[in-house]
A protein has these predicted regions:
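Active-site-proximal cap/lid insertion segments
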Residues: 10-23, 132-227
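Catalytic-site neighborhoods of secreted/periplasmic enzymes
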Residues: 60-180
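Beta-strand elements within well-structured catalytic alpha/beta cores of enzymes
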Residues: 1-12, 31-32, 56-58, 86-87, ...
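Glycine-rich, phosphate-binding/catalytic loops in enzymes
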Residues: 20-25, 49, 74, 112-114, ...
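A structural signal for well-ordered alpha-helical segments within the folded catalytic domains
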Residues: 1, 26-27, 51, 77-85, ...
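Short, solvent-exposed turn/loop segments enriched in Gly/Ser/Thr/Pro and often Arg
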Residues: 18-20, 36-57, 73, 96-107, ...
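Active-site-proximal N-terminal segment of extracellular/periplasmic enzymes that hydrolyze or transfer
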Residues: 1-37, 46, 225
Length: 227
């Protein structure tokens, strides 16, 4: 059995068409909900990214895996390599693509998982969005930039930026227009990378677990035309 786990960031149940929202259009999610199984009584073990994602990664509650906040304050900071995690699926090729946010310094390779992570908003500290400032440096080389080069795309730039009024959340509250096409955006990059990993496993005739992580619709809202 192959597993593709797709995780979005900051999506409320009532914001989906399958649960009755009249404005937001989610046709593909609605189709999955109609043809698959809905877990109507599933609840996140934590209200912030780090602890919740670590619970998905390990199958443990935050009180057990030790990461209880975004960052090291009040917790262990990293997941013990002795803890259960998806990298220990026997006989599986395991991949992570996109946002990671498990621990504070660890990367997928620490747990025997292939892939690359870049946390934060967009590609923090990488210079891809040159007119934005991020505080968290990348933990991997800039694979997104390499992918853009491979595809013959220019590096997208942000224009018409509107920041929020909260001085501590100005970047998080940002809305802006991204140059280029939707095919140059990070979500397209994530899907393209995931397809490559899946094709690799199919060629090896091995089962795979691919964890695909998008930032959206978490702010900042940086989108190209026509959105």
């Amino acid at each position: 059995m192959n597993i593709i786990y797709i995780l979005l960031d900051q999506v409320r149940k009532d914001m989906l068409g399958a649960y009755g929202h009249q404005i937001v259009k989610t046709p593909n999610i609605d189709r999955l909900a109609k043809d698959g199984v809905r877990f109507n009584n599933a609840f996140t073990p934590a209200s912030v990214c780090g602890p919740a994602r670590t619970s998905l990664f390990t199958g443990l509650m935050p009180s057990t895996h030790g990461i209880i906040r975004n960052g090291e304050k009040g917790g262990t900071g990293e997941v013990s390599e002795a803890a259960p995690n998806i990298g220990k699926l026997d006989g599986y090729n395991t991949y992570v693509v996109g946002k990671w946010h498990v621990g504070t310094k660890s990367v997928p390779e620490d747990y025997g998982i292939k892939g690359h992570n870049f946390d934060g908003y967009g590609y923090p500290g990488s210079g891809v969005y040159k007119n934005l400032v991020f505080n968290q440096p990348p933990t991997h080389s800039n694979r997104y930039k390499e992918w853009l080069d491979e595809k013959g795309y220019e590096i997208p730039e942000v224009s018409r930026a509107y920041f929020g009024d909260n001085p501590h959340l100005r970047v998080q509250e940002l809305c802006g227009l991204l140059s280029g096409t939707k095919e140059q955006t990070i979500p397209y990059f994530i899907i393209d990378e995931a397809k490559s990993y899946i094709s690799e496993s199919l060629a090896e005739n091995k089962p795979f677990f691919t964890w695909i992580n998008f930032w959206g619709p978490h702010t900042p809202c940086i989108v190209p035309e026509p959105y």
